[in-house]
């Protein structure tokens, strides 16, 4: 018995060492890439404070343009992920980053609603394959029991983009306003978009396509990864694209992800406006206060990921954050002129939304084989993009119609809560890691 325990401990230590090496080699670069990806999504929420006034955009125009990104994201997610398999992760991800960096920088030349719509749509086309593609990529390096912390580590870029992007964007709007003949929002798109093109070149040079092609893992470590991933592959039930479309659990996950994206994008596109509407006048102060919900989200996301992996439980670790997000969004709508109520609600919502995103992405790989992950994850992500369109558009339309976002926030909170309850309809025996 002692010999068996010693052998098991040695094997576990070897696995830990292998995955530690992989994490150190991959995650810093991927984390920075996703941080810029999400920064390029949410900076439009800060630009709105000046851009809408300068270009005479109504809240409906802003909400529709912000949401168009996700219509393109929905349409091009599956083909983009299929291209990742054909072209290879390194070249495809680098290409996407260079293109979206150029388009994001190009936002500084927007002069009309039509130009705003076109660039937002094209930006969605370029980014459509990035997040689902990275998820597929990581699933080919890590076994299920380690994905909770790893996906949380990767997805921490979402709240970190808010922590960094809020003060950065607010500061640029104030400090660079009218410098060299450009408005503050134009400088913001330039400063935050141009580095992405350079980062794409780094990805082209540094990101390995798979663990089979790296020199920093020895033959034994590669064999450990092969064995772990192969043993999981045998337990998966969906092995064809037709199987994806016919599986009821996949469509249940689509509904849950719809709720997750309602939560994430309500905050991403309207949090600065909600804080500003609560009586915070300065762009810089709005940026600083917007960082607080994201900072709380970072801490809660890490704790949730660790707890989920330690307990080998996924469903409640997703259900509870979604219910938290629904509660926080509803509270933010109760007293839109009260800064403490609004900020308190947004902090709870930010914690829930931040944790829900990486927790959700533990579920699809439990059903999808390696051959169907690219298409399946892209399909789920694409339907979630519809929610990402509806959240900013609904709030913008309701603000123009009723001069308040409260009713829209209540409706969104209801659907987010329903999504949280739907999580419990998934099969625990399948989604919880063995």
Task: Describe the role of every protein-language-model region.
Residues 149-173, 195-196, 381-391:
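Glycine-rich segments within core transmembrane alpha-helices of 12-TM secondary carriers
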Residues 314-363:
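C-terminal transmembrane helical hairpin of 12-TM major facilitator-type secondary transporters
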Residues 44-45, 244-302, 357, 361, ...:
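Extracytoplasmic gate region of multi-pass secondary transporters
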Residues 85-97, 309-322:
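Cytoplasmic membrane-interface "Motif A"-like loop-to-helix N-cap segments
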Residues 119-156:
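Cytoplasmic helix-loop-helix junction between adjacent transmembrane helices
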Residues 75-114:
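Conserved MFS/SLC helix-loop-helix module at the cytosolic interface between two early adjacent transmembrane helices
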Residues 56, 88, 109-115, 126, ...:
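Helix-breaking motifs and short loop linkers at transmembrane-helix boundaries and internal kinks
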């Amino acid at each position: 018995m002692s010999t068996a325990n010693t052998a098991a401990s040695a094997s576990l230590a070897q696995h830990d060492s292998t995955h530690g090496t992989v994490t150190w080699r991959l995650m810093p670069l991927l984390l920075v890439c996703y941080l810029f990806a999400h920064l390029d999504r949410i900076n439009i929420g800060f630009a709105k404070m000046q851009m809408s006034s300068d270009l005479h955009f109504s809240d409906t125009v802003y909400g529709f343009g912000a949401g168009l990104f996700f219509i393109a994201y929905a349409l091009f997610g599956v083909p983009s992920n299929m291209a990742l398999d054909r072209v290879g992760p390194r070249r495809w991800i680098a290409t996407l980053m260079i293109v979206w960096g150029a388009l994001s920088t190009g936002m500084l030349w927007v002069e009309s609603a039509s130009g705003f719509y076109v660039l937002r749509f094209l930006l969605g086309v370029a980014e459509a394959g990035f997040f689902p593609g990275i998820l597929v990529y990581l699933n080919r390096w890590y076994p299920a029991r380690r994905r909770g912390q790893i996906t949380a580590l990767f997805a921490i870029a979402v709240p970190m983009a808010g922590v960094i992007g809020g003060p950065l964007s607010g500061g640029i709007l104030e400090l660079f306003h009218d410098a060299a003949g450009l408005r503050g929002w134009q400088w913001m798109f330039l400063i935050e978009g141009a580095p992405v093109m350079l980062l794409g070149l780094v990805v082209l040079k540094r990101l390995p396509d798979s663990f089979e092609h790296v020199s920093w893992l020895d033959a034994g470590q590669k064999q450990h990864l092969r064995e772990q991933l192969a043993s999981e592959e045998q337990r998966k039930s969906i092995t064809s694209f037709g199987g994806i479309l016919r599986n009821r659990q996949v469509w249940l996950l689509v509904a849950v992800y719809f709720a997750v994206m309602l939560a994430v994008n309500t905050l991403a596109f309207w949090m600065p406006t909600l804080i500003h509407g609560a009586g915070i006048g300065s762009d810089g102060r709005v940026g600083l206060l917007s960082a607080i919900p994201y900072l709380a989200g970072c801490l809660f996301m890490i704790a949730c990921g660790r707890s989920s992996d330690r307990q080998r439980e996924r469903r409640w670790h997703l259900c509870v954050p979604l219910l938290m997000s629904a509660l926080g969004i509803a509270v933010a709508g109760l007293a839109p002129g009260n800064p403490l109520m609004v900020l308190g609600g947004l902090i709870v919502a930010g914690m829930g939304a931040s944790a829900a995103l990486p927790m959700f992405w533990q579920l699809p790989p439990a059903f999808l084989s390696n051959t169907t992950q690219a298409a399946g994850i892209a399909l789920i992500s694409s339907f979630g993009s519809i929610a990402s369109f509806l959240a900013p558009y609904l709030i913008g339309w309701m603000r123009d119609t009723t001069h308040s976002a409260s009713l829209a926030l209540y409706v969104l909170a209801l659907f987010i809560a329903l999504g949280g309850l739907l999580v419990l309809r998934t099969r625990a025996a399948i989604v919880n890691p063995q």
